């Protein structure tokens, strides 16, 4: 790639205000932590908090510990945008968009409606029509936001301003039925997807009908992901009783409960082992293929690299920053690990280089998945990436950790292999090979054990035992060899997506989840995750689940 076309140069020049090729620089001349407007704000707010709310107990003090700002406290350009932000604003605690990104996934549950409709018609002799479905949808949208009274009288209810983000919608592969339902309640596959994707999704769904419940964000925060399906199920049962004028005590109601809680429920995340201390619909159980289908870039962009990189960014924010950044590192967070893959157009540059190489030599999805192909593409892309780190010291400082560089180079290698083969297993082997090549080049990658899972990855990828060899789409943060190390999981998700992007698939794993997250009523826009994260960093993103309506008024 010609030097002037390198995508990361603009960001490097803006960040460091130096020639990116300059090999000599300065230290301790930038003003320490005071060069950061955000840290100045932290200090100012801290003084008020200590005096007014903490009774003098000290809190934030940037002069404690290692001196901050020895070098440039660099801003970050959110990749594929023109937005520059401070690093602090990408910590998930400081970014409302990243919080809502997770809220919108955790608070979602999909429930099949056909079992309940069958019980109504065959067991109770009640006719189910588009009109009765509309009546039911009116009822569930009343009851779901806060257990609003529909069966019992004299019930306490939730303030609508606390649960404005809560609603239920319906979708089906049956165009005739969809046309007869109230538009306000329908996720319209034909309108939301390009024609070929719409037809593929409807074919996968068939004539079945599904409800998507969006439980209030506040419920997921106060309770947990395991609560979501139960909250949804209770209101589904009450709404069926009301809409179809049933007796709450009759035996058939148990069938509704079983269907809504178990038989017809699709969670976003599987339950984890007891020692992980998490239930269903928690991040550790969200598989890579599911996350690929949650992200919606395939509906709005024809660029397979962009589609893949949006999944990488989403996975980095969720798996690295929230899941591992809290579960493993307890608040210190892995923000810089994650941001390496979605800032400064660096992974974009490496990935587009690989894509151009693939298009010229093989064609998109133009060759079989063989180890010769994996070795060729992964080696080419990895060496290109390492050459950039050698040529541009500013790039090396931007990715100041070895495992940051390893993750970004390997992600580009894996994505590029998928672009040629349309095979996610080949892609993840491109990742593994990149890690090994990188280690040969630099002798080590990052912290001790960073590449442990990559050293055994190639042999496991074709193993028979399912705890080693699940398809990449069905692996996740709790997959045995993947459960320990940051700087991997978001990239794995992007590699899984890239195989399907190369093939032009309508979805990666589950058409139901792809359709459910095409819903324009969601608070977070899943078609442009990086843009949304940038809005969060700029404090332009309005999140749900806030408690202002029940807090004292501020004058």
Swiss-Prot record:
Q: Which residues form the signal peptide?
A: none
Q: What does this protein do?
A: Component of the methyl-coenzyme M reductase (MCR) I that catalyzes the reductive cleavage of methyl-coenzyme M (CoM-S-CH3 or 2-(methylthio)ethanesulfonate) using coenzyme B (CoB or 7-mercaptoheptanoylthreonine phosphate) as reductant which results in the production of methane and the mixed heterodisulfide of CoB and CoM (CoM-S-S-CoB). This is the final step in methanogenesis.
Q: Does the keyword Nucleotide-binding apply?
A: no
What compartments host this protein? Cytoplasm
**Claim: Zinc is one of the keywords in the record:** no
Q: Which residues form a coiled coil?
A: none
Q: Which reaction does it catalyse?
A: coenzyme B + methyl-coenzyme M = methane + coenzyme M-coenzyme B heterodisulfide
According to its UniProt record, which cofactors does this protein need? Answer: coenzyme F430
Pathway(s) where this gene product acts: One-carbon metabolism; methyl-coenzyme M reduction; methane from methyl-coenzyme M: step 1/1
Cofactor binding mode, per the note? Answer: Binds 2 coenzyme F430 non-covalently per MCR complex. Coenzyme F430 is a yellow nickel porphinoid. Methyl-coenzyme-M reductase is activated when the enzyme-bound coenzyme F430 is reduced to the Ni(I) oxidation state.
Q: Where does coenzyme F430 bind?
A: 152
What is the name listed in the Swiss-Prot or TrEMBL entry for this protein? Answer: Methyl-coenzyme M reductase subunit alpha
Q: Which family does it belong to?
A: Belongs to the methyl-coenzyme M reductase alpha subunit family.
Q: Which organism is it from?
A: Methanococcus voltae
One Gene Ontology biological process: methanogenesis
- Please name every pair of cysteines joined by a disulfide bond in this record: none
Gene symbol? Answer: mcrA
Q: Tell me the residue numbers annotated for binding coenzyme M.
A: 337, 448
The record describes its quaternary structure and partners as:
MCR is a hexamer of two alpha, two beta, and two gamma chains, forming a dimer of heterotrimers.
Instruction: List the keywords (alphabetical).
Output: Cytoplasm, Metal-binding, Methanogenesis, Methylation, Nickel, Transferase
Gene Ontology MF term list? coenzyme-B sulfoethylthiotransferase activity; metal ion binding
Q: Mind telling me which GO cellular component terms the entry cites?
A: cytoplasm
InterPro entries on file: Me_CoM_Rdtase_asu, Me_CoM_Rdtase_asu/bsu_C, Me_CoM_Rdtase_asu_C, Me_CoM_Rdtase_asu_N, Me_CoM_Rdtase_asu_N_sub1, Me_CoM_Rdtase_asu_N_sub2, Me_CoM_Rdtase_Fd-like_fold
């Amino acid at each position: 790639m010609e030097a002037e076309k390198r995508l990361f140069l603009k960001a490097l020049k803006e960040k460091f205000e130096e020639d990116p090729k300059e090999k000599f620089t300065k230290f301790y001349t930038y003003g320490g932590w005071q060069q950061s407007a955000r840290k100045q704000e932290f200090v100012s707010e801290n003084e008020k908090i200590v005096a007014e709310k903490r009774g003098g107990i000290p809190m934030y003090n940037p002069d404690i510990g290692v001196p901050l700002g020895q070098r440039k406290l660099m801003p970050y350009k959110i990749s594929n945008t023109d937005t520059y932000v401070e690093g602090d604003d990408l910590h998930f605690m400081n970014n409302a968009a990243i919080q809502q990104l997770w809220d919108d996934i955790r608070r979602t549950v999909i429930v099949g409606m056909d079992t309940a409709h069958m019980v109504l018609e065959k067991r109770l002799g009640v006719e189910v029509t588009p009109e009765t479905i509309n009546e039911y949808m009116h009822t569930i949208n009343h009851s779901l936001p806060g257990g609003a009274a529909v069966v019992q009288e004299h019930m306490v209810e939730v303030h609508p301003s606390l649960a404005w983000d809560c609603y239920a919608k319906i979708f089906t592969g049956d165009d005739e039925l969809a046309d007869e339902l109230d538009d306000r309640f329908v996720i319209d596959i034909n309108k939301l997807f390009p024609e070929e994707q719409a037809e593929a999704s409807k074919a996968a769904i068939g004539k079945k009908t599904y409800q998507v419940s969006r439980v209030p964000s506040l419920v997921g925060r106060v309770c947990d992901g395991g609560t979501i399906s139960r909250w949804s199920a209770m209101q589904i049962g009450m709404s069926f009783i009301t809409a179809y004028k049933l007796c709450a005590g009759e035996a058939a109601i148990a069938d509704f409960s079983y269907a809504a809680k178990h038989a017809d429920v699709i969670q976003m995340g599987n339950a984890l082992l007891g020692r992980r201390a998490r239930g269903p619909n928690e991040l550790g159980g969200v598989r890579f293929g599911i996350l690929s289908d949650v992200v919606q870039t395939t509906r709005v962009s024809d660029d397979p690299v962009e589609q893949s990189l949006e999944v990488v960014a989403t996975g980095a924010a969720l798996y690295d920053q929230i899941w591992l950044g809290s579960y493993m590192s307890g608040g210190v967070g892995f923000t810089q690990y994650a941001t390496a893959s979605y800032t400064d157009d660096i992974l974009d540059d490496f990935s587009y280089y690989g894509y151009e190489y693939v298009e010229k030599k093989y064609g998109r999805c133009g060759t079989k998945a063989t180890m010769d192909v994996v070795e060729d593409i992964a080696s080419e892309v990895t060496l290109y990436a390492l050459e950039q780190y050698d040529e541009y010291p500013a790039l090396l400082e931007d990715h100041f950790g070895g495992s940051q560089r390893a993750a970004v180079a390997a992600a580009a290698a894996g994505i590029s292999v998928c672009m040629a083969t349309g095979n996610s297993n080949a892609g993840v082997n491109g990742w593994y090979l990149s890690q090994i090549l990188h280690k040969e080049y630099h002798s080590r990658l990052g912290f001790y054990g960073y590449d442990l899972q990559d050293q055994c990855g190639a042999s496991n990828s074709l193993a028979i035992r399912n705890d080693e060899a699940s398809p990449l789409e069905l692996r996740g943060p709790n997959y045995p060899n993947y459960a320990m190390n940051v700087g991997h999981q978001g990239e794995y998700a992007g590699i899984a997506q890239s195989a399907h992007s190369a093939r032009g698939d309508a979805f990666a794993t589950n058409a139901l989840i792809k359709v459910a997250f095409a819903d324009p009523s969601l608070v977070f826009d899943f078609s442009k995750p990086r843009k949304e994260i940038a809005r969060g960093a700029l404090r332009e993103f309005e999140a749900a689940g806030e408690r202002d309506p029940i807090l004292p008024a501020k004058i």
